[in-house]
Amino acid sequence: MAKKPAAHATKPKPWTEMATHLVDVAMGRKPADLVIRNGRWVNVHSGEIIAGTDIAIAGGRFAYCGPNASHAIGQGTKVVDAGGRYLVPGLCDAHMHVESGMVTVTEFCRAVIPHGTTSMFIDPHEIANVLGLPGVRLMHDEAVAMPINVHVQMPSCVPSAPGLEHAGAELTVADVAEAMTWENIIGLGEVMNFPGVAANDPVMSGEIAATVRAGKTVGGHYASRDLGLPFHGYVAGGPEDDHEGTRAEDAIARVRQGMKAMLRLGSAWYDVASQIKAVTEGGIDPRNFILCTDDSHSGTLVHEGHMDRVVRHAIQQGLKPVTAIQMATINTAQHFRLEREIGSIAPGRLADLLIVSDLAAMTIDEVYARGVRLAKGGKLDIDIPAYDYPKTAKNTVKLGKKLRAGDFDITAPKGANEVRVRVIGVIENQAPTRALEADLPVEDGLVAMDRRNDVCQIALVERHRGTGGVTNAFVSGFGYMGDCAMASSVAHDAHHIICVGTNKQDMALAVNRLGQVGGGVVLFSKGKELALVEMPIAGLMSDERAEIVAAKAEKLTEAMRKMGCSLNNAYMQHSLLALVVIPELRISDVGLIDVTTFQKVDLFV
């Protein structure tokens, strides 16, 4: 049977325009469009699970939630028997970047709807760093066309750290103020320049003020373990949430200061288990805890899930199922001031609902959004037309020259036989890096890698303006044993090209290949291309289906394993090595950056 087109993508009428009709349905004066009978209602307001519940839906909104909805059933009413299964609110991802999935908003929705996600809060600061405000507008308009709720946060820090990197575009306070007038902008994206907030940087203060004046939410990003005065200054500046905590004390500190603690489980970030102890062991009120993914790889979405995976994981860490569900529904809705629209099964809200057979395992049988079934048995019921990205969003990789092996040479100080250098140390399953040091040999005047001790080379190649600039340094933690190089045009947040390799000729081949295909990620070994994921949209996203992208990404992962890299989601770790707002040591087009002091440092110690 052919899938139904997504003709229902338009949101239902506002509650105020539908109230009289909802009242009539609730009173039995008019029939519902859909009645789901005999369910166990997971009530996130009261914390109860209420058996024998019927749900009546009209015009895409809940009209009646209670026992025996026979009075709302008419000749045209569709009736579904839940058979005693759980009725759960549609899940919300409170903070995420679609681009991390390597796919478009449309493809991301196709992948996550069967997993019960019906609301997403996306921060498109990846495409903003490449295409600026027009790029944000493209993703905003695509989001509006989706059959689920995809709210957009206006990126706040483009570039993420002025003076320490150069992105493909810049956003201003005026841009933020303009975006706050767009229909689907929910607030300001994560304010990553936390030192700037604490120092009263006028750009940061201006963006936050424009957001608050618009009555919208200010997203946070405090990527520091220092909970002293800089933290207090950051909170006083206005950010309302934070997802960068990695310890229970981080979550507690944020909640005590009136922030929402967002606990993330992405493809490479495993921060829920440590922070949830603030609730399970510390007894902290869970109302101000929210679950999110931040960054999810396409393979994770296709094979493991999305917010259902996060809720399941939180339950495994000791949370009661209802509490975990609250952290992925009503808590999120209240934070974004949308509790009258989403986040619960209650009259007037959008009819976003899951039929779940096993609550602890989050086994989702059916997914409804706006009163329409979108998925059953893990498969989409509907088709979502592809969004047509213009030519201006493509061909964004501008190298300026053909790279050669010599572009990756690092000249040693004159007369040195050995040098001590700074090394970026990868931490598996975490976004921060370590600032390491290593003694490396000098061969023919050039600093050599130390493959035996897992020290290989990293290069950042400028790709927005065709300057031909290359920053060279060293990295440890990938475990590469053979001759190889991996290059990616996804390099948070400025999104130049990052190449990590043990062989300079392979490094040149990998970077040049990305220039040919318009961006993506590629792995070479001994002159041969082992895997390629093309991402022609801004050099960040594929225009193919999520399943195809996931298969290509799995081929990449397997090729990396054969080269000796056993890191969990090594590609995601690779893509963050230039993120100059998360400690400790990063690379940018400016040079090596010490993110504990926000200063450029020399490669040689």
Curated annotation (Swiss-Prot):
Q: Which UniProt keywords apply?
A: Hydrolase, Manganese
- State the InterPro entries in the record: Adenine_deam (IPR006679), Adenine_deam_C (IPR026912), Amidohydro-rel (IPR006680), Metal-dep_hydrolase_composite (IPR011059), Metal_Hydrolase (IPR032466)
| The protein's name in its UniProt record | Adenine deaminase
Cofactor(s), names only, from the UniProt record = Mn(2+)
Q: Does the keyword Manganese apply?
A: yes
Q: What class of enzyme is it?
A: hydrolase
Q: Which GO terms describe its molecular function?
A: adenine deaminase activity
Which transformation does this protein catalyse, written as a reaction?
adenine + H2O + H(+) = hypoxanthine + NH4(+)
Q: Which GO terms describe its biological process?
A: adenine catabolic process
**Any Pfam family hit:** Adenine_deam_C
Which HAMAP family does this chain map to? Adenine_deamin
Q: Which family does it belong to?
A: Belongs to the metallo-dependent hydrolases superfamily. Adenine deaminase family.
EC no.?
3.5.4.2
Lineage runs: Bacteria, Pseudomonadati, Pseudomonadota, Alphaproteobacteria, Hyphomicrobiales
The record's section on CDD domains has: AdeC
UniProt keyword Transcription regulation present: no
Q: Which PANTHER family match?
A: ADENINE DEAMINASE, N-ACETYLGLUCOSAMINE-6-PHOSPHATE DEACETYLASE
